[in-house]
């Protein structure tokens, strides 16, 4: 039984790594986003770390403290990760892939849990590494004014962890929605408009909209000292979204006829 689980775990990893979407997204989050973060920090250094709208008319708000610099850039990667989650979630239903996978592991419950676990761990690792590279690049761009890119600070490591949780939970949610609907379209229609400021627009006007997934996730990204206010609440409610949707996907998967899966 353990050998079957190990084989199934490796199979899931291979499918993720060799997916075309993974090959596209990884360069975005590992190379392009850190580069953007570096360029942004250079621009901040040119303006001045103490600049405010009063001293520089091009600024809308004051430059945030050093520990918060770089986190604005990771919103780009969040967009890419949500798309990746949606594609990975719907991937099993393409070209009868699901039926082929179940030949390796006929126990649908074990198959789903293994697949969900492997995907979640992969997503968290990618999220953490990407965000670290982006923040390290930003601090490197600040030259002597910045923190050591290797050591950073306790607060920055805490912010990186929160950002990684935000990315991971939103990406796994995107994955679960796509798995439930057997298509990436549901995830993209529900989550991407929220990333494009729709979530913030609604949250500013409707109290309940603050509990939309992307709004909760963005509350975990330390773009300014005003942002990280109730991280425990945000993680709790965002985790609840993931738990509920993934449970629906799980029970639907157990009951459906895989032969008619598409």
Predicted regions and their residues:
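Aromatic- and glycine-rich beta-strand/loop motifs that create alpha-glucan
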Residues: 1-30
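Junction motif at the cytosolic side of a transmembrane helix
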Residues: 15, 240-262
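Secretory targeting signals
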Residues: 21-22, 26-88, 112-180, 197-200, ...
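Membrane-interfacial segments
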Residues: 43-48, 93, 97, 137, ...
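Transmembrane helix boundary and interhelical loop/hinge segments in multi-pass membrane proteins
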Residues: 83-104, 108-109, 116
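Alpha-helical transmembrane segments of multi-pass membrane transporters/permeases
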Residues: 184-193
